[in-house]
């Protein structure tokens, strides 16, 4: 028999159990990424299919976009999407190595000089977003010491990424600056 790369699934839980209902919901309504994550966490699936599904959201600048975080749509990379990607990688034990080095280069490129991440990058507006996502106009020089076009750093955007990278023992120059910003 040819090897397909798919891991054999354990038998499904009894038909009336909450896990069975959750599994049915995932297979009927979720994106491929969430299906692979469910299989990884509950059906003894591998991490490679999760990583492959996540790769579809990676952008040319090594960030993540394409609506990875459901609260923000559009193809462009955003710190919000990239933080979501790091959480996925962390959940499957793959938050390290060259993959995360490339993500840190992206984070360096989009952060303020002190390492802070913006919630939403300027110039990336015009795509649908949840009503609570802070999409604001490009900062003016008067309200931003960095000048027009530079985003304000946000603690709420920076802290989760910094904490996750520290938990995974990632070392990067951007991370040192971002850590100082958080403290």
Which residue ranges define each predicted feature?
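Preference for long, amphipathic alpha-helical scaffolds in soluble/luminal domains
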Residues: 1-183
């Amino acid at each position: 028999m040819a090897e397909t790369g798919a891991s054999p699934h354990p038998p499904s839980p009894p038909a009336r159990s909450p896990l069975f209902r959750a599994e049915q919901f995932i297979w009927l309504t979720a994106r491929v990424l969430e299906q692979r994550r469910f299989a990884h966490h509950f059906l003894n699936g591998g991490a490679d299919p999760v990583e492959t599904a996540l790769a579809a959201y990676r952008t040319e600048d090594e960030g993540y976009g394409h609506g990875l975080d459901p609260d923000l749509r559009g193809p462009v990379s955003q710190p919000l999407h990239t933080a979501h990607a790091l959480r996925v990688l962390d959940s499957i034990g793959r938050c390290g190595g060259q993959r995360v080095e490339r993500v840190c280069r992206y984070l360096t490129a989009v952060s303020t000089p002190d390492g802070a991440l913006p919630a939403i990058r300027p110039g990336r507006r015009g795509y649908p977003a949840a009503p609570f996502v802070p999409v604001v106009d490009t900062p003016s020089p008067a309200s931003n010491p960095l000048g027009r076009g530079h985003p304000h750093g946000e603690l709420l955007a920076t802290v989760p990424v910094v904490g996750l990278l520290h938990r995974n023992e990632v070392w990067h120059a951007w991370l040192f600056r971002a850590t100082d910003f958080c403290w």
